[in-house]
Amino acid sequence: MLSSHCLKKHNHFHCMRLGPRPAIAQDIARLGSAGFVTEVANGVVIFCFNAILLRLAGDVGVAAYGVTSNIGLVVAALFSGLSQGMQPLLSRERGRRHDENVAQLLRTGLFTCLGLAGVMYLGLFAGTDAVVAIFNSEGSAQLAALAKPGVRLYFLYLFAGGTNMVLSAYYSAVGQAGRGFGIALLRGLVLIVPMAFVLSHFFGITGLWLSLAVTDTAVLALTLLTRRSSRR
């Protein structure tokens, strides 16, 4: 279907020979760095969580994390879709210097994010037994005992974590890629890994489940503090 458009004589798209443009490639890499860090960090975090759970609870602990991580993929996709949907709109309004529209889009994105987080967390909290049962076909009581509190504690991160994802996308879209990269790096790698080891050392599996929520809350607090200080 697309080729038929290109073959028509009355179109404005033509093949052109273009050489490499390092400046453009650099801009693309800079603006996409936050997303890159997020994707790479996911693998590192999963590895660390599995290693800690294997030490604390054996194979059953790893299976319990499998429940939360699989649900987390769906949840992250929703926040990622929201963030990616905002970015072109934010960039357009920023380019037009419509600062009021940029602020309105950010507010709408944040309210939508918190609404999604609230609905998803309430759904997971109320339906924990049913959700865990989907992944516990053998009816293991040990797996259920680990996974049920895991779901309820792990997904407390939705509120601060979703907000961080929206803010990271916002900064990348309005030309402040450094801040967006900083949020992604802190929440995805720099803080979460040591936080997981420290909290699991002192509070066991409960500390591990809470490590993501604690990390995202700390990153959000730091982001809001730096945002406020930059306005002064």
Located regions from the model:
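Core transmembrane alpha-helical segments of multi-pass membrane transporters/permeases
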Residues: 23-52, 85, 117
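Short alpha-helical transmembrane segments in multi-pass integral membrane proteins
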Residues: 1-33, 90-156, 198-232
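Helix-terminus/linker motif at the lipid-water interface of multi-pass membrane proteins
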Residues: 36, 43-70, 74, 92, ...
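Hydrophobic transmembrane alpha-helices of secondary-active solute transporters
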Residues: 34-42, 50, 76, 80, ...
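Short runs within selected transmembrane alpha-helices of multi-pass transporters and secretion channels
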Residues: 1-4, 80-83, 154-173, 179-188, ...
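Alpha-helical transmembrane segments of multipass membrane proteins
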Residues: 47, 51-52, 74, 166-170, ...
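Hydrophobic residues within alpha-helical transmembrane segments
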Residues: 33, 37, 41, 68-71, ...
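Small-residue-rich hydrophobic transmembrane alpha-helices
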Residues: 64-122, 126-128, 161-179
